């Protein structure tokens, strides 16, 4: 059986990592959430999710992320992967999303794009939750609104699975995603 590359796309606070953890438990896929890579440089800097990440540090995070994608391409054929990301609605966001799809193509893996959506007020509530302190995740509701207003979200691909995580519990969302590879 060929591997699967799941691509969970959504704004900060939409539950990408939480859904990804449930999906990993259901499928055995490796969870490669965006903070796994970027926190390698964000944490030494002291990023706390409240103060903005300077452009120089974002560039370092992008370099580490690129190395992670390179390693993902080298995975054995029996390894499926779950990537999580917030892709902005601009050329950079589209290019980043394409890089993850390219991993699937290079690995001859099935590509399953999933858009996680949630109302902004619920996202704002979630980003302030204390469990987001474990990683250098955005934790400021005002910054969240600014990011979403300034850069938006990448438009969903045709045929992508759409899940409202404000109305769908994480385990149910993961079950819906896992069902894509059995149908």
Spans of features found by a protein language model:
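Small-molecule kinase domains that catalyze NTP-dependent phosphoryl transfer to phosphate-bearing small molecules
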Residues: 125, 129-176
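Glycine-rich phosphate-binding loop used to anchor ATP phosphates in small-molecule kinases
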Residues: 60-115
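Conserved substrate/cofactor phosphate-moiety recognition/catalytic segment
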Residues: 21-70
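Conserved Walker
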Residues: 18
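Conserved glycine(s) of the Walker
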Residues: 15
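Hydrophobic anchor at the beta1->P-loop junction of P-loop NTPases
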Residues: 8
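P-loop (Walker A) phosphate-binding loop of NTP-binding proteins
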Residues: 11
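Conserved phosphate-donor/acceptor-positioning beta-strand/loop module used by diverse small-molecule
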Residues: 105-128, 163
């Amino acid at each position: 059986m060929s591997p699967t590359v799941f691509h969970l796309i959504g704004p900060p606070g939409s539950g990408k990592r939480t859904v990804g953890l449930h999906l990993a438990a259901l499928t055995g896929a490796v969870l490669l959430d965006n903070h796994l890579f970027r926190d390698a440089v964000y944490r030494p800097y002291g990023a706390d999710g409240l103060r903005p990440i300077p452009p120089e540090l974002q560039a370092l995070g992008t370099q580490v992320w690129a190395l992670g994608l390179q390693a993902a391409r080298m995975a054995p054929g029996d390894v499926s992967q779950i990537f999580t990301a917030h892709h902005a609605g601009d050329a950079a966001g589209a290019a980043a999303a394409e890089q993850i799809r390219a991993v699937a193509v290079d690995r001859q893996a099935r590509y399953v794009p999933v858009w996680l959506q949630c109302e902004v007020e619920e996202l704002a509530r979630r980003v302030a939750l204390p469990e987001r302190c474990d990683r250098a995740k955005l934790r400021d509701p005002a910054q969240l609104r600014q990011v979403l207003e300034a850069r938006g979200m990448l438009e969903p691909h045709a045929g992508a699975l759409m899940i409202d995580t404000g109305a769908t519990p994480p385990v149910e969302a993961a079950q819906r995603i896992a069902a894509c590879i059995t149908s």
